[in-house]
Amino acid sequence: MNDCANYMDYILNKLDERTLLEQLAEEASELSQAALKLIRAKGLSENVTPKTEDGVMQNLAEEMMDCSIVMALLSLKDKKIRTAVHHSEGVSENLKWKRWAERLGYEEKK
């Protein structure tokens, strides 16, 4: 087993599902803050920030990775979550894309 797999196993054995869900909520909140900060850093808002766009982009990428890691751990920890995630891939994913596009005014060409 490589180091990463050892770390994952250790974390999965150490933390229960509730703790992982709490961690996901925290990381998702930090991701939200990073996305809002990037809006400001790019000058897309009147409320500018002194932080650089590159620095804020790096923070956003880190928060995205943090969320991905916790989501992966949750899918390994809980069979129901894993099943729901794998079941929703593909068919549901297309429906989500379609709904989003339609909300934005997309019309299928006939």
Describe the residue ranges of each PLM region.
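Flexible "arm" and connector segments at domain edges
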Residues: 1-110
